[in-house]
Amino acid sequence: MKKNRISKNWINKQKRDIYVRQSQVDGYRARSAYKLIEIDEKFKIFKNGISVIDLGASPGSWSQYISRTVKSGRLVSIDLKGMEEIENTIQIKGDFTDLESQEKIKALFKSKVDVVVSDMAVNTTGIKDIDAIYTGELAMEAMNFSKEMLVKEGRFVSKIFLGSSFNEIVALGKKLFKEVKVFKPKSSRKESKESFIICKILR
């Protein structure tokens, strides 16, 4: 009975969510697209013709927005889960943390890339502090990978959670990049500890 009540509450919440409704109008696969749109509007991440890597891409709303924005550029997306095709997007089904997957990504670019984004998060354990730690580890691995892949003026965007690893992630960002900001989009649910770290210009 409790599970059914939770499911009904979730469904009702989704129906009331303006970003869920707007995503259906705009053709995005998830409301998370609007988080990236807000980030882009504030921090000027994307433009036509650039090269981008999207880590943890499924179900694909970030890749959809990036594809529409970079147009003639190059976009490579990776996720453990397969997803429907997206125009102007090369998709890899695999675990980003595997070296083999990282080598596949590198092989698809002849030179350094302009942007790396990550919306990766672990499967939730139900213990928020543990989830924050594991997701933080993914963010730091993505950040270290971006150092290898980005041009000097490159940009890195990643989901992070407020928790014990938060300061460590920000410190790593400041070690690797000249400009580091933490931002919580309006489209991120108020009750969520989710924020995003935006880094620019490699040291």
Swiss-Prot record:
Tell me the GO molecular function terms.
Answer: rRNA (uridine-2'-O-)-methyltransferase activity
What are the protein's UniProt keywords? Answer: Cytoplasm, Methyltransferase, rRNA processing, S-adenosyl-L-methionine, Transferase
Subcellular location, record wording: Cytoplasm
Q: Which sites bind S-adenosyl-L-methionine?
A: G60, W62, D79, D95, D119
Q: Does the keyword Protein biosynthesis apply?
A: no
EC class (word)? transferase
Enzyme Commission code = 2.1.1.166
Supply the InterPro entries for this chain: RNA_methyltr_RlmE, RNA_MeTrfase_FtsJ_dom, rRNA-MeTfrase_E, SAM-dependent_MTases_sf
Please give an example of a GO cellular component term from this record. cytoplasm
Pfam families, per database record: FtsJ (PF01728)
**UniProt-listed Gene3D superfamilies:** Vaccinia Virus protein VP39
The UniProt catalytic activity note for this protein reads: uridine(2552) in 23S rRNA + S-adenosyl-L-methionine = 2'-O-methyluridine(2552) in 23S rRNA + S-adenosyl-L-homocysteine + H(+)
Q: Which family does it belong to?
A: Belongs to the class I-like SAM-binding methyltransferase superfamily. RNA methyltransferase RlmE family.
Q: What does this protein do?
A: Specifically methylates the uridine in position 2552 of 23S rRNA at the 2'-O position of the ribose in the fully assembled 50S ribosomal subunit.
Supply the name of the protein: Ribosomal RNA large subunit methyltransferase E
What organism, scientifically named, is this protein from?
Pelagibacter ubique (strain HTCC1062)
- Source taxonomy lineage? Bacteria, Pseudomonadati, Pseudomonadota, Alphaproteobacteria, Candidatus Pelagibacterales
